[in-house]
């Protein structure tokens, strides 16, 4: 009996010192769900309807709303005008917002980057290869989506 107490203590100590399995990073609840990089029609005219034909969709797969104020979407270039910053916008649980490249009136489901004019310079997404980045208000990468194909007009992420 006198041996039982030290033996139990040894087992408890050994169990406490056993390293836990590494935790896997949780999948983001807000992510880029689609990039439509080749607007309909050819050639790309730079008209607002054509520019709005390219867009990125951001989806909240979580169970609670997420405040996107200060979050950014950008492509892989380092150009400052290729960054969209969310203003006051809350993405409800299970919902998707479409961010169109051109100009328009923002709604609860569609936002507009505000780019226009400049012909093909109004477009954001390259038609053959690019990467979309979604960052939170602190600048931390939340999700990215890359494509490398001219055989399709869009990429589901």
Give the location of each predicted region.
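A structural motif detector for short, solvent-exposed N-terminal "entry" segments of globular domains
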Residues: 2-10, 19-69, 121-127, 147-156
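Solvent-exposed beta-edge/loop recognition patches
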Residues: 24-30, 42, 81, 88-157
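A mature extracytoplasmic/lumenal domain signature
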Residues: 36, 62, 70-72, 77, ...
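A short linear-motif detector with a strong N-terminal bias
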Residues: 36, 51-53, 76-78, 112-113
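Residue-level detector of beta-strand face positions
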Residues: 57, 72, 131-133
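The feature marks short-to-medium sequence segments in extracytoplasmic or secretory-pathway proteins
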Residues: 66-91
């Amino acid at each position: 009996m006198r041996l039982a107490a030290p033996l139990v203590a040894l087992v408890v100590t050994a169990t406490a010192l056993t390293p836990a399995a590494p935790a896997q990073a949780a999948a983001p609840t807000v992510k880029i769900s689609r990039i439509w990089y080749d607007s309909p029609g050819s050639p790309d005219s730079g008209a607002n309807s054509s520019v709005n034909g390219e867009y990125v969709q951001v989806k909240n797969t979580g169970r609670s709303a997420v405040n996107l104020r200060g979050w950014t979407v950008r492509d892989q270039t380092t150009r400052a005008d290729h960054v969209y910053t969310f203003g006051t916008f809350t993405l409800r649980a299970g919902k998707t917002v479409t961010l169109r490249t051109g100009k328009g009136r923002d709604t609860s489901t569609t936002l507009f980057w505000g780019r226009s004019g400049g012909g093909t310079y109004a477009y954001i997404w390259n038609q053959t290869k690019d990467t979309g980045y979604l960052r939170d208000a602190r600048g931390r990468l939340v999700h990215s989506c890359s494509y490398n194909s001219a055989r399709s007009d869009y990429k589901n992420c």
